[in-house]
Amino acid sequence: MAIRNFNEETLTAEVLRRIEDTPDPRLKEVMTSLIKHLHSFVREVRPTPDEWMTGIKFLTDTGHWSDDKRQEFILMSDTLGVSMLVDFLNYQAKAGMTESTVQGPFHRPGAPEYPLGANVAKDPPDGEPCVVRGTIRNAKGKPIAGAALDIWETGVHGYDVQKGDAMDLRGIFRTDAEGKFWFRCVKPVSYPVPEDGPVGKMLTATGRHPMRPAHLHFMITAPGYDCLVTHIFVKGDKYLDSDAVFGVKQSLVVDFKKNAKGEWEASYDFVLKPSKQARKAA
């Protein structure tokens, strides 16, 4: 029976009734849960009209701050712990496989591809010289040749997109026949997530610091394997236990040491998870 005079008790049921004919079952499931939780949130918090409009403005501003070089919504998701929760639920690495973590808002498609051993840092480099090397294998220890490593990091003065520069401190490398990779970059440094937008204001308002521990981003792909999005973190960084985006996992913490040439050096081996299709075919 149609209802015109809704109240606090009847409104939610009517909103849910109106999406009953949603043809996509997954969309219906998601929207049903979203409506229930959103209405429950409003009942619990009981925002005033002004407070509700403040929330609407925050989301509107978050959209305005997002573009092809910066994703403020990802930053919001990261700093609220939602990105890591999605990661936990969807990428559960089995024993021996490399753990994933958040992608973050600063990945840029179309990074230049370099030969192994090349330097992703412009001259002069924005930081201390560093060499990173390792191997990519499957769970059985077999090297994966031709795997693509899309890497990116911040310099001492921020990410390239924050400085308005052309691509710097990012690039794509491919493993050799033995699954090995090596490249030059700068030693990762700790840095603040952007504080000039709505997410930065949210952190300030809630008494949180914006710092991320020093790390290097990796997005690793290879045919027959799930894409791995992860970091390696610098051992000893003071923000490892209070990462603003909750992204640290102990298995990803790496010791960076000086080599004989006075450069920083780190080594890390990645183990990829076979794709669902590959597991079915096995």
Identify the residue ranges that each predicted region occupies.
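Beta-strand-dominated extracellular/periplasmic modules and repeats
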Residues: 2-282
